[in-house]
Amino acid sequence: MDRPLRLLAWVNLFLCLGLYAAAVALYFVNQPAPAWRQTIDLEVWNLSVLAILFPTVGLLIVVNQPRQLLGWLLGIIGLITAITVLATQFAIYGFYTQPLAHTLPAVALWLRSWLWIPIICLVAFFMLLFPTGRLPSSRWRWLAYGLLLTTGALTVINLAGLAHLPTDFTAEPALTSPWERITGPLLVSFPLLLLMSLSSLLVRWRRADVLVRHQIKWVVFASVMLGATLFLGDLVVEQIWQDPTVRIVVGRGLIALGFATVVIAILIAVLRYRLFDIDLIIRKTLQYRCV
């Protein structure tokens, strides 16, 4: 019964690797890049953590616990990120490197304009469901519904047009969305929802035993690091470095470091503090193979 789920997890990982490899290949084809495109080009590298490491850790969880939702969340985050990175590089290729007459570059640009939204939603859901794969209690359903509604609304707004793409990414005039006026409040609500999801970990920590507290504390630390790099990284970098290129590289590097700390925290919880008992399963498997 669980074998198809394990197979699907492997397929997802290889799909992520293939899409990301194609994006990297297009990245080198698209070089050299003008100054305005440096931030976009660096997405290939700073999003590699999401596109490769997240589905890898997700596979580790799903192979041993096929019905554990947290593993699938990591795998889906990786897949959406890989699609986003590839779409970005293909759009650059189709608009600038080798201008194409058909609509595929525009479709790729359109995908880039809204795929980031479900990524943030899934990261928030991961924090909300960690470490059991379920809500802390039924009282937290309102937060899950809020995440779904906010994600759905922002996705619909961005699906309706390309109003929020960088103006220097394409020479074509951006389409405007009829619901653009409500985008601001929705974007402000996203960080608030993320903080509320993080607060659920603190609630779990207070109620948990010693072992579960160890599992949670690493993910809380990593989540705080990620939030700091996402929302404060650019501000700090601007105060230290004057060179725009250095700012971009260091700022995006900090974001990649933030995502990497999340992966490391999950691995510590899984392997060091027996989350899902995966360490025991791996140890027994190795002992069986040695015998």
PLM regions and their residue ranges:
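Alpha-helical transmembrane segments of multi-pass integral membrane proteins
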Residues: M1-V291
